[in-house]
From Swiss-Prot:
Encoding gene per record: frdD
Intervals, Periplasmic compartment: 36-60, 116-119
GO cellular component terms, semicolon-separated: fumarate reductase complex; membrane; plasma membrane
Organism: Escherichia coli (strain K12)
Parts of the chain on the Cytoplasmic side: 1-8, 90-96
Protein name per its UniProtKB record: Fumarate reductase subunit D
C-alpha cells in the first residue's frame, strides 16, 4: 500500500548545491587558478589585461559580484556537504550534524553575500 503522506526529504536541495559546487570546482576554479595564480604572475597576459583597475571594475560590476559570490559559495557548499557525509561514513556522529554543516554553509553564504555586496 502506498503511503498517502510520505515523509519529504530536504536532501535534494543540499545535493543540488553540492552538485553545482562540484561542477564549479571542477570546471571554473582550475581555470581561475591557472589564470590568476600562474599566468598572471609569470607575465603571460598581454598588456594590462588584468590590471588592478580592470579587476576592481569587474569585481564592482553586477556580473563580477555574482561571479565572486559563486566562486566562494558553491565550492563551500560542496566541501561542507562532503564533510557531513564523510563524518557519517566514518561513523563519527556529530550531534545535529546536518544543522552544524549546512548551518555553517548558510552562515558563510550570508557573510559572503554581505562581503560581495559591500565591495
Amino acid at each position: 500500500m502506498i503511503n498517502p503522506n510520505p515523509k519529504r526529504s530536504d536532501e535534494p536541495v543540499f545535493w543540488g548545491l553540492f552538485g553545482a559546487g562540484g561542477m564549479w570546482s571542477a570546471i571554473i576554479a582550475p581555470v581561475m587558478i591557472l589564470l590568476v595564480g600562474i599566468l598572471l604572475p609569470l607575465g603571460l597576459f598581454p598588456g594590462d589585461a588584468l590590471s588592478y583597475e580592470r579587476v576592481l571594475a569587474f569585481a564592482q560590476s553586477f556580473i563580477g559580484r555574482v561571479f565572486l559570490f559563486l566562486m566562494i559559495v558553491l565550492p563551500l557548499w560542496c566541501g561542507l556537504h562532503r564533510m557531513h557525509h564523510a563524518m557519517h561514513d566514518l561513523k563519527i556522529h556529530v550531534p545535529a550534524g546536518k544543522w552544524v554543516f549546512y548551518g555553517l554553509a548558510a552562515i558563510l553564504t550570508v557573510v559572503t553575500l554581505i562581503g560581495v555586496v559591500t565591495i
